[in-house]
Regions:
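N-terminal, charge-rich interaction modules
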Residues: 8-90
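Structural motif
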Residues: 40, 133-135
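Gly/Ser/Thr-rich loops at beta-strand to alpha-helix junctions
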Residues: 43-50, 137-145
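Long, charge-dense
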Residues: 70-117
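Short beta-alpha junction loops
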Residues: 76-78, 140, 165-167
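A short, acidic, amphipathic alpha-helical segment used as a generic capping/interface helix at domain edges
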Residues: 116-128
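Short Gly/Thr/Asp-enriched flexible loops that form oxyanion-binding sites at enzyme active sites
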Residues: 144-155
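Short, flexible loop segments at boundaries between secondary-structure elements
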Residues: 156-167
């Protein structure tokens, strides 16, 4: 299912993505068994806003028009919600002023566990959405303290996942 496009916002990119992601075999429908459950939608970092708009339109309009329930799960939102709920957001912002980049990354890696924080939140959000396919976004915003390869290796869901990332 590999195809490269010059621009993620191109109409042909959108139609290709919708066509592929609404396929019954990919979704495990009508007696088909999914061959794989994780897909990657890379885009150039300079096209971030186009990728965000594309995923929003595909999830809100294109896939539902084909009978596919899609959900977006934003890793950055999960991280911010967790830090805020634990009362860690303000102290982290204060520490950012004095810490080096590497120290800040270490603080975040020690605080935001993929296994105990991110994974359960992603699985919960996918389950609550009762979706046929889930788009994981916010990957660039959480790199390098959230490693998506670790997350994908640990997620336990039958829902196909599309990892949307700058790269």
């Amino acid at each position: 299912m590999t195809r490269k496009f010059e621009h993620i916002g191109a109409p042909e990119a959108r139609s290709f993505i919708v066509e592929r992601l609404s396929d019954d075999a990919l979704l495990g429908r009508k007696g088909f068994t999914m061959r794989q459950s994780t897909y990657v939608l890379p885009y150039p970092p300079s096209q971030r806003s186009y990728a965000r708009d594309l995923v929003a339109a595909v999830c809100a309009d294109d896939l539902p028009n084909r009978g596919v329930r899609a959900a977006q799960v934003n890793l950055y939102d999960i991280v911010l919600d967790y830090l805020d709920s634990q009362g860690m957001w303000e102290p982290l912002c204060e520490a950012e002023q004095a810490a080096t980049r590497d120290e800040l990354i270490m603080m975040l890696q020690d605080t935001i566990s993929v296994t105990s924080v991110i994974k359960p939140a992603v699985e919960r959000l996918i389950g609550e959405a009762e979706c046929d396919i889930a788009f994981i976004t916010g990957v660039g915003e959480t790199f390098p303290y959230v490693r998506t390869h670790t997350l994908l290796g640990e997620i336990d869901t039958d829902t196909p996942i599309v990892l949307v990332f700058p790269g």
